[in-house]
From Swiss-Prot:
Keywords: Cytoplasm, Methylation, Protein biosynthesis. PROSITE patterns: RF_PROK_I. SMART domains: PCRF. Peptide chain release factor 1 directs the termination of translation in response to the peptide chain termination codons UAG and UAA. GO terms for cellular component: cytoplasm. It is found in: Cytoplasm. The keyword Cytoplasm applies. This is Peptide chain release factor 1. Pfam families: PCRF, RF-1. The keyword Transcription regulation does not apply.
């Protein structure tokens, strides 16, 4: 590990020199790329330097203990040695996590697709609850949310809805939300007070660059139609809504949020690319998952990941056995406690993988 950290520190110094070189700054595209690489290494280098400083201080205190005869100074040195030993253990753990393989999609913006599952109108209302939860979470993170498409019901639910979430680290946090979400509650329409179970499916897709995936124009069928709002009423007098069908896979994407047909087409193409990219990534991850049966989650949208129990005010994440009794605030976007636990578990699994490789 130390050899790798020394290499990273040297690379960081090299990048520091490059990004301050006027000749490199003249090429803005290259300069921005180097600045990002420099920023990505900064936390590792700073932590490593703190680790080296603690090591030096520890050796200094040990030397003092050998040479010093004053009782008070020896006690001070012994106390410092204890503190520095614990600090070095913490920093070593932190460095191990920082050196874990990074998900190349973590810095990307995302599309969140929410679809009502089993449960009819109640499932559609739950899909609406989930959309609000992610919207409120995005607000807490100062991320931007844009509606791409929606299929609303007459009483405020959604059969399906797609939104774009743009902001730093959006995918790194939201990627753990893919899967089947289950709700247990008494519907407003239930006169007998019986608890119903309904589901909604969430898919979180990283927005991909043109270089990540190529689409042949001949593989697309593009239809235009008039946009509709809640309950199906027409909200536009021109054919601005766009439906794109990817013929080889049968994937269909719609977008009706913008008044401009061109903008709707651009947004729909971004979603289509994200879906095709996800399909390719899922195929690749399937073989890896065979060796990681206990992993936090495959991101498979058929995997039941969480239950929201209204009578008990309880949320249970089935992947890690986490139970929280804060349903109201959770649905208001306070979901970081669950996400942090999932991140920690994911890191532990990656560390196990590294151990198997080594």
């Amino acid at each position: 590990m130390l050899e790798r950290l020394n290499f990273i520190e040297n690379k960081y110094e090299e990048l520091s020199n490059k990004i301050s070189d006027p000749s490199v700054m003249a090429n803005q595209k290259e300069w921005q790329k180097l600045c990002k690489e420099h920023a990505d290494l900064e936390i590792i280098v700073n932590t490593y330097r703190e680790y080296k400083k603690a090591q030096e201080d520890l050796e200094s205190d040990k030397e003092m203990l050998k040479e010093e005869s004053d009782k008070e100074l020896r006690e001070m040195a012994q106390e410092e040695i204890k503190e520095l030993t614990l600090k070095l253990e913490d920093l070593e753990r932190e460095l191990t996590i920082l050196l874990l393989p990074k998900d190349p999609n973590d810095d990307k913006d995302v599309f969140i697709e929410i679809r009502a599952g089993a449960g009819g109108e109640e499932a559609a209302l739950f899909a609406s609850n989930l959309l609000r939860m992610y919207t409120r979470y995005a607000e807490r993170k100062n991320w931007k949310v844009e509606t791409i498409s929606l299929n609303a019901t007459d009483i405020g639910g959604f059969k399906e809805v797609t939104v774009a979430v743009k902001g730093k680290g959006a995918y790194s946090r939201l990627k753990y939300e893919s899967g089947v979400h289950r709700v247990q509650r008494v519907p407003d329409t239930e006169s007998s007070g019986r608890i119903h179970t309904s589901t909604a499916t969430v898919a979180v897709l990283p927005e991909v660059d043109d270089v990540d995936i190529n689409i042949n124009a001949n593989d697309l069928r593009i239809d235009v139609y008039r946009a509709s709002g809640h309950g199906g009423q027409c909200v536009n007098t021109t054919d601005s809504a766009v439906r794109i069908t990817h013929l080889p896979t049968g994937l269909v994407v719609t977008c009706q949020d913008e008044k401009s047909q061109l903008k709707n087409k651009e947004k729909a193409m971004k979603v289509l690319k994200a879906r095709l990219f996800e399909a390719a990534e899922a195929e690749r991850a399937a073989s890896i998952a065979e060796d990681r049966k206990s992993q936090v989650g495959t991101g498979d949208r058929s995997e039941r990941i969480r239950t929201y129990n209204y009578p008990q005010g309880r949320i249970t994440d089935h992947r890690i056995g986490l139970t929280l009794y804060k349903l109201e605030t959770f649905l208001d976007g306070d979901i970081d406690e669950a996400i942090e636990a999932l991140v920690t578990e994911d890191q532990a699994e990656k560390m196990k993988d590294l151990g198997r490789v080594n």
